[in-house]
Amino acid sequence: MILLISDLHLEQERPDITRAFLALLAGRARTAEALYILGDFFEAWIGDDAMSPFQRSICQALRELSDSGTRIFLMHGNRDFMLGKGFCKAAGCTLLSDPSVVQLNGEPVLLMHGDSLCTRDEGYMRMRRYLRHPLTLFILRHLPLSTRHKLARKLRNESRAQTRMKANDIVDVTPDEVPRIMQQFGVRTLVHGHTHRPAIHKLQIGDQSAKRIVLGDWDRQGWVLQVDEQGMNLGSFDFVPETVALLN
């Protein structure tokens, strides 16, 4: 069994999400071969040298899962692209490049966070290229912590405001970009997050059937894609104690 999740946006202000995630780690994830986290794991990340006690507790929980035998793979999102090797080493997880092709049930599957598919949002794509540039990352990592905190708050507030103002199709994936990148990597299955629009989309690429699985965000409920001998099942659960207990 392999589990895939994304867009938890973990932060101390949302203990309900944290409880649900920790229940997943202590339960179903313990029997999984691997856990893939496809970006926006944290609501914000300003550097491995600036871990808060809350973030350290999450790191320790991941380490315990890793030590139990479950492999953990972590991909950058647009909120936590500064996660680095230091965190991954401490958490016992492997940093996964975006995009990456992995074998799931013997089939090559393309994994992405999903923000790079939203090419119609030209302003965001420009900002993404700037923030992910190695020189920008070097500068950001060497800014004082207070400056990084202020910058992170500013970027989050601007992102939320701009998203509310943009048309729905602009902040969703570009339809033509999906088959293009799937053909580029030679896959018939794509799994991504970012858009907060969980669904399984069927599509046609040439003469072959294909599918795009969109993971949900953990805001009002949690979402997990489970891959096993039965196939790929995208499911959700509520953040109530009775439902969270079922994750065990």
Swiss-Prot record:
Chain residues that bind Mn(2+) 2: D40, N78, H113, H194
Binding positions for substrate per the UniProt entry: N78, R79, D121, S159, T163, K166, H194
Catalysed conversion reaction: UDP-2-N,3-O-bis[(3R)-3-hydroxytetradecanoyl]-alpha-D-glucosamine + H2O = 2-N,3-O-bis[(3R)-3-hydroxytetradecanoyl]-alpha-D-glucosaminyl 1-phosphate + UMP + 2 H(+)
EC number(s) reported in the record: 3.6.1.54
Topology of this chain in the membrane: Peripheral membrane protein
GO molecular function per UniProt: manganese ion binding; UDP-2,3-diacylglucosamine hydrolase activity
GO cellular component: cytoplasm; extrinsic component of plasma membrane
Binding of Mn(2+) 1, residues: D7, H9, D40, H196
Keyword Membrane: yes
Enzyme class: hydrolase
Cofactor notes: Binds 2 Mn(2+) ions per subunit in a binuclear metal center.
Cofactor entry: Mn(2+)
Keywords tagged on the record: Cell inner membrane, Cell membrane, Hydrolase, Lipid A biosynthesis, Lipid biosynthesis, Lipid metabolism, Manganese, Membrane, Metal-binding
Pathway connected to this protein: Glycolipid biosynthesis; lipid IV(A) biosynthesis; lipid IV(A) from (3R)-3-hydroxytetradecanoyl-[acyl-carrier-protein] and UDP-N-acetyl-alpha-D-glucosamine: step 4/6
Family: Belongs to the LpxH family.
HAMAP family with a match to the protein in the record: LpxH (MF_00575)
Function, as annotated: Hydrolyzes the pyrophosphate bond of UDP-2,3-diacylglucosamine to yield 2,3-diacylglucosamine 1-phosphate (lipid X) and UMP by catalyzing the attack of water at the alpha-P atom. Involved in the biosynthesis of lipid A, a phosphorylated glycolipid that anchors the lipopolysaccharide to the outer membrane of the cell.
NCBIfam families the record matches: lipid_A_lpxH (TIGR01854), PRK05340.1 (NF003743)
Name of this protein: UDP-2,3-diacylglucosamine hydrolase
Name of the gene this protein is made from: lpxH
